[in-house]
Amino acid sequence: MNKKSLPLMALRDMVLFPGVIAPIFVGRKKSLQALSRTTISEENNTKYILVTLQKKFDQENPSKHELYNTAILAKIIQIVKLPNNTAKILIEAVARVKLSDIKDEESFEANYEIIPDEEILDMHNMRSLVDNAVQLFNKYAMNDKKVNTEIIETINKEISNKTNFINIINILASHLITSLETKQQLLEETSPVKRITTVITTLTSNIVNSETEHALQQRVRKQIEKTQRDYYLHEQMKAIQKELDEDKSELADIEKKIKSLKLSKEAKEKAESEFKKLRAMNQMSAESGVTRNYLETLLSLPWGKYDNSKIDINQAEKILNRDHFGLEKVKERIIEYLAVLQRSNKIRGPILCLIGPPGVGKTSLVKSIAEGMGRKYAKFSLGGVRDEAEIRGHRKTYLGSMPGKILGQLKKVKTSNPVMLLDEIDKMSSDFRGDPASALLEVLDPEQNSHFVDHYLEVEYDLSNVVFIATANSHDLPRALSDRMEKIYISGYVEEEKLQIAKNYLVPKQFKVHKIKKDEITISEDAILDLIRYYTKESGVRALEREICALTRKALKQILADNTVKNISIDSNNLEEFLGAKKYNFGLVEKEDQIGSTTGLAYTEVGGELLTIEALAFSGKGEIKTTGKLGDVMKESAMAAYSCFRSRAPNFGLKYDNYKDFDIHIHVPAGAIPKDGPSAGCALFTTIVSLMTKIPVHRTVAMTGEITLRGNVLPIGGLKEKLLAASRGGIKTVLIPEENVKDLKDIPPNIKENLEIISVSNIDQVLKHALVEMPINKGLSYDL
């Protein structure tokens, strides 16, 4: 070859020797550039390239000074392009060369000069050295299965030709297990004798290391096998011994508990009988597991364990007032209940049942009662329960059987006299698995619950010291169950009570949860009132607490997002900036007096509402139509009001001989909301009279009351909520049934001060105060 300059490629982890064929993966940019610049030799139509080892393995882009000058001239046999701009080449090392004038540009390029081997002077000695090296290599190959058999065959083939000593030395050198630096030194060595001597020394070292490692592995393997066998046998022996000891120890513990616990006579006899069976059983049998579980359950109940509670009604009252605002009647009845317990120290009174809409504090009241009595609190949620086994338990014969939740709660609180909440007692149902309401009869009957028998235990357990308190959203309970309980109705909070609860409880609670500093966020009273009126519609305060939480979060976000904002004041003017548009609206008084339109008062589970009732007359057949999603009772009230009006038409100076020629349509707005009840009778009657006499109704007058066909006004419920709605809506005068006057003592003073409350006993008194003028003896006839 005449050309003395070729592209140069640096290798990371390989030293090639002349005569060796090797594959190389090419991925670095300079190496790929060098590969692309190779040209076909004119002499033999072949591409050549220079390859050399770089001095530092981890160098990604070595400079020309970081390359060894002793390199290999290689012939490129094959180039295969791979994905990701890489390639695989197969090269044959042709000769050892000395590099000079290395150029470091886009790729390496260098001049080269072939380095010849020194002449072998003593061929006989060389033959002996090579034979020795080959024998060592064969021995090494037998110990190390990684050496390819083809390499051994190639070496044996070359040794038969006495002139190929150099090739044999190079092949042996390329397969030595040694450092890259040692291999590079072998490449640089020009003396064949010195090279073969180094190869023999390295092979000898490799064989010794391999034999030592192999012997060590054998010794370690035998030791591990022996250790594992000994460990397995030892652990098996320990497990067997432990099982035997544990069984004995566990049986001894069960026997000790039977003797030490204050079991009833019946329970002790049952426990001893079951224990005798267990001791005689095979401890690995399934039946022994059932018996063991039964005994563990029986002995884990708090037999004879009672909290030493001392009831102090003054302290209990303080706790109730601390945790709950308002609810005075409810608190008073609870204190009376506790007073009886304090004096008698025995529970024989009725079971309390707190009935009210969600969120009014029924569950938290029971917690406060437990704290006031100094007893533990247990809760049994009955919502959705339809299997009586939840109360009485499953019989032992069933797979996975367990005691009922009543005893389960006693086991949990570890006392036989807790305060137990029976939550959502109205939401039980029954199916083919039984009626849980009937199962509760025994639990709640003071004459029976001292002998309560759970199906799982099959022995009596005394529940007479448990204080049972139930809660419900509806008074619709099975009669037998209802008969065993004293119902306390919680009507819900009025606006003023919600305001005080928010100021004194909810806002401080949310500020504490969100780590609000003093004076960092202030929420005005009018903002809280707007929250109650326009963002919540409930009888309790759960939604109100959620809105206060949202308000606090948004205000805190503003403070943290803007360092210039140190505090935020929230009032009714900027409330919508935080919570968006108002969600609800309460009724407001009409802007002017209207004919055929009257303001009634309604009571819903979320409080009182103004109820507008309007009517029109048109040609027809003398019928009365009602719309607004009215219930049957309210429709009947409309019919009664119309009949009452027609019977009294002559008193108003009206002729009724043409009533069959027109229809009256009564509508109650908010048609999507169901409405029912008899208390709109007065308002319906007044609306019809106003329509037929064409006399307006005072816009600031609202009314409530059921009427009879004879015109008498009957009492209604929900007076407190209705009066609050009237006061809130701008009403000045409210007409109420005379029989409801006794309920005014429960109305907050501020509401009574804002309203003129007039009691009425008949519809004539209603018309006197409701209509702008009385329609008497006017000689009117109704014309369309």
UniProtKB/Swiss-Prot annotation:
Gene3D superfamilies registered for this protein in UniProt: 1.10.8.60, 1.20.5.5270, 1.20.58.1480, 3.30.230.10, LON domain-like, P-loop containing nucleotide triphosphate hydrolases
GO function term, MF aspect, one: ATP hydrolysis activity
Keywords linked to the UniProt accession: ATP-binding, Cytoplasm, Hydrolase, Nucleotide-binding, Protease, Serine protease, Stress response
PROSITE patterns on file: LON_N (PS51787), LON_PROTEOLYTIC (PS51786), LON_SER (PS01046)
E.C. designation(s): 3.4.21.53
BP-aspect Gene Ontology terms: cellular response to heat; protein quality control for misfolded or incompletely synthesized proteins
Annotated binding of ATP, by residue: G356, P357, P358, G359, V360, G361, K362, T363
Enzyme class (EC, first level): hydrolase
Lon proteolytic domain span: 592-773
Protein name: Lon protease
Organism: Rickettsia typhi (strain ATCC VR-144 / Wilmington)
Native organism taxonomy: Bacteria, Pseudomonadati, Pseudomonadota, Alphaproteobacteria, Rickettsiales
Chain's gene name: lon
